[in-house]
Amino acid sequence: MAGAEWKSLEECLEKHLPLPDLQEVKRVLYGKELRKLDLPREAFEAASREDFELQGYAFEAAEEQLRRPRIVHVGLVQNRIPLPANAPVAEQVSALHRRIKAIVEVAAMCGVNIICFQEAWTMPFAFCTREKLPWTEFAESAEDGPTTRFCQKLAKNHDMVVVSPILERDSEHGDVLWNTAVVISNSGAVLGKTRKNHIPRVGDFNESTYYMEGNLGHPVFQTQFGRIAVNICYGRHHPLNWLMYSINGAEIIFNPSATIGALSESLWSIEARNAAIANHCFTCAINRVGTEHFPNEFTSGDGKKAHQDFGYFYGSSYVAAPDGSRTPGLSRSQDGLLVAKLDLNLCQQVNDVWNFKMTGRYEMYARELAEAVKSNYSPTIVKE
C-alpha cells in the first residue's frame, strides 16, 4: 500500500496491538521510549489552524560532572505543494514561502534552534518529467536568491539556523544547476552551502537530466547550537556518505528528501536510524507529502505506461539518536513539524560505550579502497 490510505505506522500499531505487545514492538522498532515535549498550547492551536501536525520529543543523556548538557532543539518540516504543479512559477514559490513561514512561526513558539526543510522545497519534485521549462525556472542563487533572502529574514527574526534545500543556479560557473542546501546562521548570514553527492538513476528519478553529483565534498557547519551537516536524499543509501560527515565532526546530520512509497518506504525507517548508530550522531530524516501531478505524461524507460505523477510521497519524517532510539514518524499524509530536544552530550557518551570510531579500522579500508578503484584491481577471492 503505497498511497495515503493510512496515516502512519504508529497509528496502525496502536490501533491493532494490545498495550503490552505494543510496548515491546516499539522497544524493538524505536529503542528506548522518549519523553514527549510539553509544547506550548498556542503552538498546537496555531498548527491546528494552519492544518499541520505538530509533535515533540526529547532525547536525554546521562548527567555528567564536568560537562553541562548541550541542549539544542531541532525542527523538521514536511509538506505538500500548496498549488497545482501547473500554476505559474512565481505563484508556486510565493505560496510555498507563505506555507513555510507559518510553520516556522510555530517552530519559534516551540523554541526551535535549527530548522530544516525538505529537498527542493520551493518547487514540485518535477525532475521525473525530464522537461526543462518551466522547472528550471525554479532555480535560484544559493547566495542571494529570493528564497535565501526569505530564509535570512526568518533566521534573524527567530534566532534560528535555517537549512534550505533548493534547486541552485550557479551563475558564477556557467549557469550550472545543482541540488543544494543553503545553511543560514541564526544571525541571518549565509554560513555556506552543500550539494547532493549522489544522484539517482532509478525509476522516475531522472535527476541527472538537470544536475550532476555535487563537488563540495562533505562540509560540516559550526553553528551556535552545534555542528551540523546535510546529506541530501539519495545520499542516505550510501554509508560512506554519512561516515564522511561524521568524520568531519557532524553532531547532527539532516537528510532532506523526496522519496516515494513504491520505491523506498520499506527502507525509510531503517537507514537514518542505522546511520545515527554507526556514526555516533543524531540524524534527521525529512520527506515531502502527497502526490504531485504534472501537465504532460512522461516515461522513464522502465516499461511502465506513460503517467503524469511521480508517485506518493509518504512523509514519515523522524529523528534518530546515536543510541538507536528514535521518534515516531510524522504522518504519511499531512504536513507536519517535528520538534526534537537533543542533548549533544549523548554523541560522546555512546561513542565511549560502543567505540565504533576507535574500532573502525579506517586505515585498512582506506588502503583497500584505494586499490579497489584502480582500473587493474583484482578482487581478493580465495579459490580451491
From Swiss-Prot:
It is found in: Cytoplasm. InterPro entries: Aliph_Amidase/BUP, C-N_Hydrolase, C-N_Hydrolase_sf. GO terms for molecular function: beta-ureidopropionase activity. GO terms for biological process: beta-alanine biosynthetic process via 3-ureidopropionate; protein homooligomerization; pyrimidine nucleoside catabolic process. It comes from Pongo abelii (Sumatran orangutan). This is Beta-ureidopropionase. Homodimer, homotetramer, homooctamer; can also form higher homooligomers. Keywords: Cytoplasm, Hydrolase, Phosphoprotein. PANTHER family: BETA-UREIDOPROPIONASE, NITRILASE C965.09-RELATED. SUPFAM superfamilies: Carbon-nitrogen hydrolase.
